[in-house]
Amino acid sequence: KEKDIWLKPENIEFEESAAIPLVALTAHKALIEIAQLSKGSYVLINGCTGGVGSVAVQIAKSLGSEVSGICSTNNLEFAKNLGADHVIDYKTENVLEKPISYDVILDTVGNLKYSQSKKILKPAGLYVTTAATIPAMLFGPLLNVFRQKKAKLVMNSPNSKTLSEIKSMVENNQIRGHVSKVFKLEDVREAHDLSERGGFTGKLVLKM
C-alpha cells in the first residue's frame, strides 16, 4: 500500500534506510503525537541505545528537549554521541534515586514500569511505553481516568504523512539510523539469535 512505502532519503545508504522506518515511526508516535514534546521538556528514555530509543533521543533533541538516557556501561559513549544530555548506567545507578523529575518518560525496554516511574514524573508528567504487558494494555486506559499522571501505550501503524516527515528529518540530519550489523540472507538464524540475545546498539539489517 502507498501509506506503507518508505522512500529512501538521498543522503543515506540502503542499509541505513532499512533500519529507520519502523523505529522512527514508533519514536515519532510516542514523543510527537502522544507526548506532544516541546522545547525545554525533560525527557527520560529507557533503552536509549536500542532501535527505538536511539531515534527517540535524536527526535527529542531536535525538538529542544533536555534528554536523559538509560543504557548499559558498554553503550554510554554511544548514547552521548546520539545527543543525550545525561546518561545513566543501569548497572551502577538507580534512576529512581536521582533528584530529578521528568515531563515525559519513554520506556522502550519494558523494565521501567509506570508504578515505579510515578515517583520521578512531574505532576502533569506522562509515561509512555512501547513494551507494555497485556494486563497493562487491557486495564491501563480505565485506570488513567482516575490519574493525573497518565500512562500511554504506543500502538503504531504506518502512514505516508509521518513517513514523509521522518524522511525530511533524515535529510536535514536531525535523525540518523544506526546499523549494528548487516547479515546475508543465509545467515538469518545468526541474526535472529543475536536479536534474541540483545546487547547491541541500533538495529540489525538482513540483506536480501
List the predicted regions and their residue ranges.
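Terminal helix/beta-alpha structural elements that buttress the NAD(P)+-binding lobe
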Residues: 1-208
